[in-house]
Design a protein with these regions (language model features):
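Flexible loop/turn connectors
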Residues: 6, 10-118
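Short beta->alpha junction loops
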Residues: 1-5
């Protein structure tokens, strides 16, 4: 199953909740696309009824309707750190886990807005 289908299914499950959230932060932009599809099928408008935020800023995120708010992580840094950590583990230079913080940037577009409290 592709990520968009997971987003579609996740959104529909959330919609069935008695107290559906007003915002969803999904694991990646492809899942966000699935959430967009589900929202459309259910009849909810983004961002008027629900805010959606993605992760990884795929090139098409800014062309979605409305443009997707997303978090961009420098993937080259992530890959570089992953290779370095793998080399350390393979060479038995590191036994303990290491916490890595990567630079990220929030790209605020039109898929989020402050919603009034639901009654």
């Amino acid at each position: 199953m592709c990520y968009a289908k997971y987003g579609d299914r996740l959104f529909k499950e959330l919609h069935e909740l008695e107290d559906m959230p007003t915002a969803i932060f999904v694991a990646n932009d492809s899942m966000a696309a699935g959430c967009y599809k589900a929202a459309y099928e259910i009849g909810l408008k983004i961002p008027e009824d629900i805010s959606i935020i993605g992760f990884n800023d795929i090139p098409t995120a800014k062309y979605m309707i409305p443009p997707l708010t997303t978090v961009k992580v420098q993937m080259e840094y992530m890959g570089e750190y992953a290779v370095h950590m793998l080399e350390e583990r393979l060479n038995e230079e590191r036994e303990l886990c290491m916490k890595v913080t990567l630079p990220a940037r929030l790209h605020i577009r039109d898929s989020v807005k402050e919603l009034k409290q639901r009654t």
